[in-house]
Amino acid sequence: MSSLTGKLIVIEGLEGAGKSTAVNLVVELLSQKKISTITTREPGGTKIGEILRSIIKNPEYNNVLDDRSELLLLYAARIQLIEQVIKPALNVGQWVIADRFELSTLAYQGGGRKMDMRVINELSNFCLKGFKPDLTLYLDINPELGMIRAKSRGKFDRIEQESIEFFHRIHDTYHILVKQNPEIIMIDANRSLEEVQSSIQSVIEEFIEHNL
């Protein structure tokens, strides 16, 4: 992404990890440095992407939406987001802060759904053509604690209704992916909000220092 002047920062993690709060904090920190930002989310972020999100998240499609269909819908939404939102923003120097990206698919579909990682990687290569974030923060939280926090937000969506074993597989896969990709920054999200925000602030300030 050296030809693009903006930066893509991705916040990853299980339900209840505090991704939305982290996105808001990153935006605030960047704004203090007079950096123009936009935020987005996956799946979604575009008109088509939000329609696909409503399908993927809808509890009515429990036991109806095939895992392969879900995977393809996610990549369809991601392509639209990259081409319609992320790349145009990066090209004019804006920094994009995304709630989820490619790592979620590897963790949720590869780990949670037990899909073949080789297939996912091949699909990724075809759809994304090597497009990657400049910085990924993974908020690591115990699955049980994450679901308690998520439940406090209200009714569960189709993904949130999965078993706790599903989320443990995702959690384990995230850890494997972080070990395989040392550029991903893992932050302990089991701690207090103040401690988590302090860690995020340190990472972002260092990243800004090296990229301005």
Curated annotation (Swiss-Prot):
It catalyses: dTMP + ATP = dTDP + ADP. One of its GO terms (cellular component) is cytosol. InterPro entries: P-loop_NTPase, Thymidylate_kin-like_dom, Thymidylate_kinase. CDD domains: TMPK (cd01672). ATP binds at G13, L14, E15, G16, A17, G18, K19, S20. Keywords: ATP-binding, Kinase, Nucleotide biosynthesis, Nucleotide-binding, Transferase. The keyword Oxidoreductase does not apply. Its EC number is 2.7.4.9. GO terms for molecular function: ATP binding; dTMP kinase activity. It is an enzyme of class 2 (transferase). GO terms for biological process: dTDP biosynthetic process; dTTP biosynthetic process; dUDP biosynthetic process. Phosphorylation of dTMP to form dTDP in both de novo and salvage pathways of dTTP synthesis. Belongs to the thymidylate kinase family. This is Thymidylate kinase. It comes from Legionella pneumophila subsp. pneumophila (strain Philadelphia 1 / ATCC 33152 / DSM 7513).
